[in-house]
Amino acid sequence: MSFIKYISDEFHYKEVLSLVKKTKRTVWIGTADIKDLYVDDKPFLALIASLLKKGVEVRLIHAKEPGIAWREDHEKHPILYDGMERVLCLRVHFKLIIIDSTIAYVGSANLTGAGMGMKSPKKRNFEAGILTDDPEMLEAAIEQFDNVWIGKFCKDCGRREYCSDPIK
């Protein structure tokens, strides 16, 4: 029997990011904004680097160029250069985390401290999403991510002139 769980505020960190740590094969992340998010006491990118060292495939689609702190964290982990696949798409506004093609988060939270509930209660964003292993919802999330990943919409994109790194 599949499950669908409502996730809000700090539970993004407690329930969603805790699952990323347990990834065995693949983690696909889609976010509009990405910043120097921390998991426990380490940068999220350190977690991604450790997953890559275990042979996990990591794909990241984001809309904005990351900030300086994120880029500095990226520099500390050389495996991220060739190991983490990354695509920039200005039109991405979805927030998806798909783990091992068996569970998906779909919601409003960007991959930032405020979005994922890491900030204090007075500073974090009010976010909402669902966590599910429902086959129909999972397949829809995978298909949407994959269509952007392969550049299905690039040819006719009305923002192509602003795209610094077109997929196709």
Residue spans of the language-model regions?
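Short beta-alpha junction loops
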Residues: 62-68, 92, 135-137
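Glycine-centered positions within short beta-strands or beta-hairpins
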Residues: 101-102
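Signature of lipid phosphatidyltransferase scaffolds
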Residues: 105-168
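Short solvent-exposed loop/turn micro-motifs enriched in small/polar/acidic residues
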Residues: 87-91, 123
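Primarily the HKD phosphodiesterase
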Residues: 13-81
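Acidic/glycine-enriched edge-of-secondary-structure segments
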Residues: 1-10, 31-35
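Short beta-strand scaffold segments in enzyme catalytic cores
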Residues: 95-98, 128-130
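A conditional alpha-helix N-cap/helix-loop micro-motif detector
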Residues: 9-10, 40-41, 86
